Amino acid sequence: MANFNDLFIFEMANNHQGSVEHGIKIIEAMGAIAKKYQINAAVKLQYRHLDSFIHPDFRNDTKAKHISRFLSTELNDAQFLELVKAIKANGLTAVCTPFDERSVDLIVEHDIEIIKIASCSADDWPLLEKISKAGKPVITSTGGLTPVQIDNLVSFLTHAGTEFAVLHCVGIYPSPNQTLNLHFIEKLIKRYPGVTIGYSGHEDPDNLDVIKVAIAKGACIYERHVGVPTDTITLNNYSMNPEQVDNWIAAAKTTREILGSPEKNITESEASSLLSLKRGVFAKRPISKGETISADDIYFAMPCAEGQLTSGEFGAYRATYTASKDYAANEGLFETCNRDTYHKIREIIHTAKSMMMEAGVVLSDTMTVELSHHFGLETFHETGCLIVNLVNREYCKKIIVVFPGQVHPEQYHKRKEETFHILSGSLVATIDGLDRHLKKGDILLIERGMRHAFTSTEGCIFEEVSTTHFRDDSFYTDPSIALQDPMARKTMLDSF
């Protein structure tokens, strides 16, 4: 598999100027920068067989700027192979854009790792057919394509079994800010789940704002035209020189650092800083060990010591506290909340609702909720699941939430046949002793009598569609569960 994650693509295009020596100079410059920043990087070439690519009547047409540019920088197959070897020798991935079918064959012959589809070729179906049969990972730009055209391309590559990534791109050279439309990156990510999305840029080489926004929007591949200027070579106004490339990557790395993790990370320094501003709980009068502490017994003041009960903790809904020691008047209280069933259930419900909101699973208010806890509510996070009952007639539909690390014990049904449809996350379902690894979008049929258990490492939400559900139709293979009253291992809620 290709490593598309945080891949920087240095597009050489024709900036080699028809010189292998200068092309290698560009490769070495990019290799040094990639090594400096320890990044996943590639150099991209362009292959065209100009003897057939350009119509014979136009080979001497000086008005067609692209034709004269291609002819003046032409390299033969052997010269391109030298560049490919130099790319690999510098620890970089070789990528190439073919503009005709013969060039696809040459890419395979040169053992280039990734094929890149140019925006202008993204609807060239004869070329796309050839590329899809090359057996190489593909990255495609989408400049100038409508969403429907991108849908067609993604569908084609998917059905061809091609490993691929999609790059947002604007085919204007250079691209002004107002044309970039980087919001579209988010739409591509939502529209094609599981597909790596990136950005191929042609903006001013000194414009570092664009890479920052692209990464913030979710791009994971970044492409720019690069070159090395000399006394006789001047780069075009959308190609980066090595100094600009260095600045570009530094900006990308800083952006990644600023973005951090998608999970909330509270550092010790942040917690300490906030604690210094909180109010602590202090005894208004002497309090004896074993007393239930009421609001009349305490007052709030700062500073609050490390581990001391805060005003927010004391005033939380249904929070109760019992003195674990004797307290003198004005002494700070160090206690933990007496957690009741309400607090445990609320935590479970809030976690499940958050998982569903993040997954985009929207439910109505007309439903019931079951907490299935086979060994008690205290062990819910280890064993069980949360079930949302939507309808139960001749057909039945439920939404089932499996928490990270949670296991649902093995059972089978005699009357009910069911189908699991994974909506979010991943699930390992064990069917009659065999593991099935399921991801988002997968469907699993469980027939009557099939023993099944499931678990999830990262958490999972799936839809269960079945025949009518009967409460006495779940048969557990663990005797300690089978002997329980079915309602003893359930907590029923009217709604979220």
Task: Enumerate the language-model features and the residues they cover.
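A short, N-terminal "cap"/entry segment at the start of jelly-roll beta-barrel domains
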Residues: 341-396, 481-496
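Short acidic-glycine-tyrosine-enriched beta hairpin
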Residues: 433-451
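Catalytic cores and adjacent flexible loops of soluble metabolic enzymes
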Residues: 1-347
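Conserved short histidine dyad/triad with adjacent acidic residue
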Residues: 381-384, 396-414
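Structural/interface elements that position substrates and couple domains in central-metabolism enzymes
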Residues: 6, 65-67, 374, 379, ...
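Double-stranded beta-helix
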Residues: 457-496
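Glycine- and acidic-residue-biased ligand/ion/polar-headgroup-sensing regions
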Residues: 403-404, 414-432
